[in-house]
Amino acid sequence: MTLPLLGPMSLSGFEHPWFFLFFFVVIGLVALYIVVQLARQKRMLRFANMELLESVAPKQPSRMRHLPAVLMILSLVSFTIAMAGPTHDVRIPRNRAVVMLVIDVSQSMRATDVAPNRLTAAQEAAKQFADQLTPGINLGLIAYAGTATVLVSPTTNRESTKTAIDKLQLADRTATGEGIFTALQAIATVGAVIGGGDEPPPARVVLMSDGKETVPSNPDNPKGAYTAARTAKDQGVPISTVSFGTPYGYVEINEQRQPVPVDDEMLKKIADLSGGEAFTASSLEQLKQVFTNLQEQIGYETIKGDASVGWLRLGAGVLALAALGALLINRRLPN
């Protein structure tokens, strides 16, 4: 949590937990204070002239006189927590990652169950995704129907990606597996160029489709979608699938209506096999929200940040109050 004036504070993820041994010192000080107070009380009871004692001493000494000591102990507790090095989760933009946006442009994407049609709505949401994605991420674009084509190699230039999205054209058949394999090849190519470390940059495939794979007919074939998803899993590239459309979509072929219901099941299995996550959307608004959620997941990474400063500030503030209280209540610093 983050508190005003103090900053982030946490009670987890300690980097130097051995500093908690200092709590034994704090406990010792508490015990010493109690012993001193009891001894002080005994000395007062041995006062020779009890009548004089009752006349000069308050009948019930104020408990406020213990406040400075309590505050000092609390400040030591706060300082001990700070020295133990607590951490908290910090989200920072990624600047070394690759995302391949793979869009289905088969004929079923001209269905009008999503206004004005599936492809146009997908184009609008995809361009929003490109705009929202953090600037340091390399974004590429692949369109697939019967074959897959890399329209934009992974780049931080969002304008080129959006221009290519606007130019998407419908084609026959649906080769989802080829679209995934093409994305994996593009990721491997750019990863070798921008590696910048011992490991390749983190990568993700975002697959948007509305229907079942038709080429090949069996998704478990060597070039099928399920085989491609397993390959993505082996390469450490999760696939986020977005199934887009409704069960009532249709297209007209030779003046006859051909049902093209969305196939959520296949896309979910692709995501599961790859270690990714499946999303569904049946309207443009839902699709935009899905891409916003994806941007939040992909565009940022969570790291451990220091959360000790807040405890140091709290300890210093409480210690100052202890000193002030000692001067006002006891007219001296607590001992």
Swiss-Prot record:
Q: What is its main location?
A: membrane
**Location(s) in or outside the cell:** Cell membrane
Which residue ranges run through the membrane?
A: 18-38, 67-87, 309-329
Q: Which InterPro entries match?
A: Aerotolerance_reg_N, UPF0353, UPF0353/GerABKA_families, VWF_A, vWFA_dom_sf
Question: Could you tell me the keywords of this UniProt record?
Answer: Cell membrane, Membrane, Transmembrane, Transmembrane helix
Cellular component GO terms, alphabetical: plasma membrane
Residue ranges annotated for the VWFA domain, each copy included: 98-294
Q: What family is this protein classified in?
A: Belongs to the UPF0353 family.
What is this protein's name?
Answer: UPF0353 protein Mflv_3659
